[in-house]
Amino acid sequence: MAELNEFLILSSRLCNFEKVEMQFVLLMKKLLYLICTFAALFALKSHAAVPEGAIPFIFDSHLYLQATLNDTVPVTVIYDTGADFLYLDEDYLKLNNLQNAFGRKGVAKMGGAGNSEPQRVEIFVDSVEIRCGELDYWNKITPIIRLRDILGRYIDGLLGNTHLLSSPLEISFSKGYLKQWEAPFPVDSLENYHKLEARFEDNRIDVKASLQIDSANAVEGWFRLDLGSGSTVSLTNEATSSLHLDDMPKAYFRTQVGGVGGGSEDVEIRAARFCMVDTFENVVIDCSLNEKGALSSGRPYLGIIGNDIWSLYDMVLDPVSSSVWVKRNGKKGTYSQSSTTHMAVFDRTDICDGWIVNGLYKGGIAEQAGIEIGDVIIAINDRPVKEISWEEQRKGLNLKGETKYTVRKANGEVVTYTLFVQKQII
């Protein structure tokens, strides 16, 4: 998800489209969906000390915000500090008949975290207004990308730094809100916060940190602050190549879609400790094998730090003074945990009746059973996955022991696999 702005407009083949009226019934359905999705969140916020003007979010490895496009169109976006502006999901537009709702289109070339060359995508070249909380932004160019192929059905779009980080931004993972502040930020209000060594360049944020793999392997330097990543720490291919990992326990992982730009390959290992303000021990990290994209070589950072680390803090990002302030928030985190099902899936019940297998660990229980990337899981222990709500997914299914997966293969055949879910992959 990092470096989503790496695109060059190749052509200005603009087509004039008449702006379509939004059908009342369609909008009501979408509004009802959003109201139901965020109802529990807003009920909680009413009891929490959320500042006036703050933007509440649901945290599910990413920060999900409710917003509105052009005053009328509901949209759920995530905040990604590895991106610049507004991006919209292709299936969100198609399923809601919004393909031509935001004016003229052009073509762009765009890269990202995936392991492939930059790809051609459609863009809206007319400005799109987005309202997020009490904040209004006009987005000049809006790429149309396949975000749901990366994160699943509950994402409609993505919002980057150009809009949300135009002034000091408070991010409270403990209370679930963002809040923009006027500059200068009142530093005297940051009691118990720690200031990180940081740099703000090219609309991105890097911080200093160190990673000790074992007694023979360590890296120290700049890491990208990436709220668009749900992982702990992901090293670039170049940083990975500098290490001696041959004798270390490791798990090979590959995905069909690892980010904008295609699939990805990496190895997971356990690092002895990761040090920033605090020291985290026994951390599961990713070591990229990608030859292209944001985690390849030649990058001005050693890797990216994702939300498995940042969610343990409340933060203030201040682009005016190029400062990052953090305070531990009491959460224990999952940075020492790795997969027990040995596969990665995402919910695509918006377009089919199941969860699509997007990633597999080499030699893991899922691969050994016969599950393949691209398979559609339609039931777990005879329970249709369409019945499993987003809230239940966020809490975790806590699968243990003998577990039956009913799967639809690429040829349409329905097969049941039995996995014994117990051990972490690494």
Each PLM stretch: what is its role?
Residues 7-15, 21-52:
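Bacterial Sec-dependent N-terminal signal peptides
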Residues 47-426:
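Pepsin/retropepsin-fold aspartyl endopeptidases
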